[in-house]
Amino acid sequence: MIIDRVQVEAINSFSNLELLKEVYGLIWILPILTLLLGITIEVLVIVWLEREISASIQQRIGPEYAGPLGLLQAIADGTKLLFKEDILPSRGDIPLFSIGPSIAVISILLSFLVIPLGYRFVLADLSIGVFLWIAISSIAPIGLLMAGYSSNNKYSFLGGLRAAAQSISYEIPLTFCVLAISLLSNSLSTVDIVEAQSKYGFFGWNLWRQPIGFLVFLISSLAECERLPFDLPEAEEELVAGYQTEYSGIKYGLFYLVSYLNLLVSSLFVTVLYLGGWNLSIPYISFFGFFQMNKMVGILEMTMSIFITLTKAYLFLFISITIRWTLPRMRMDQLLNLGWKFLLPISLGNLLLTTSFQLVSL
């Protein structure tokens, strides 16, 4: 069989095209891998900070043997859970039991798609960014309910029911607060919301324009994270460990990861929606604006904006960790009353007030 020169060139061009597609695929996945690496490091830092802050509040030393200042303690705990035996309940629903933790983790990780960590540093700048986050985060309680139901354990099932009830109770006030912010910014895009706060610097933050909404969003975020005083789905004194009771090994580690990922996502959204995101508090002044724009200056500006965003997020993290180790747990009826009888009317009134001001200003 004789192949002429034209056919050989066609075959070579086709192979080159396939190679370019593979290279493009690798380049496209690099930002996702970078984000996953950053998320992993952030979770390890949050775990270390919580242990140090809780030790300081309780006048203890905290972790000190695993690495300098106990920095490697979280890695040691994760490695231990990785090699633990994965025990399955004999009378449980094994497929649902295995899928539950994965659904919770994936739903939280997808929320990072629309979070602008810095200037021009967001995976997906969508026109419905904040609503996509609310929709995705609503899937996580389904995984927790599946975990509780499939364990065939009364404590686990009650914990799953509590998680679902708590999520529904506080998702609605949180959504109303996000709607009020969207009205002020005339957009549902997270990037547009941050840029709308940059005009007047520190005084342009939505924290000052929406103080009531900020407080409601703060409380609702803590409840969504199931942190003390809102950790009723896994109350040790009542439910052993709630929906996590029958889990061990890596699956238990996934639930541990979900709680800190949820806390990180909530902190970043507090920063994006109310604290100006990556913007500094000085209006109209950018240090890098004095230099001619090039690649190096662009990288420095992006790095600086990521640093500013994370610094603001750590403020909320510090508040939530301090609250966890200082306030007692609420009862279930108190938690539901707070969500339905107080936060829901307040958030609805705040939304109506914001809508009225926007209509008057037209």
UniProtKB/Swiss-Prot annotation:
Determine if GTP-binding is one of this entry's keywords.
Answer: no
Membrane topology term reads:
Multi-pass membrane protein
UniProt-listed PROSITE patterns: COMPLEX1_ND1_1, COMPLEX1_ND1_2
A GO biological process held by the record: photosynthesis, light reaction
Instruction: Report the EC code(s) recorded for this entry.
Output: 7.1.1.-
Segments passing through the bilayer? 27-47, 94-114, 128-148, 164-184, 202-222, 247-267, 303-323, 335-355
Gene Ontology molecular function, alphabetical = NADH dehydrogenase activity; oxidoreductase activity, acting on NAD(P)H, quinone or similar compound as acceptor; quinone binding
Q: Where in the cell is it found?
A: Plastid, Chloroplast thylakoid membrane
Cited InterPro entries: NADH_UbQ_OxRdtase_su1/FPO, NADH_UbQ_OxRdtase_su1_CS
- The protein's enzyme class: translocase
Subunit structure of this entry?
A: NDH is composed of at least 16 different subunits, 5 of which are encoded in the nucleus.
Q: Mind telling me what this protein is named?
A: NAD(P)H-quinone oxidoreductase subunit 1, chloroplastic
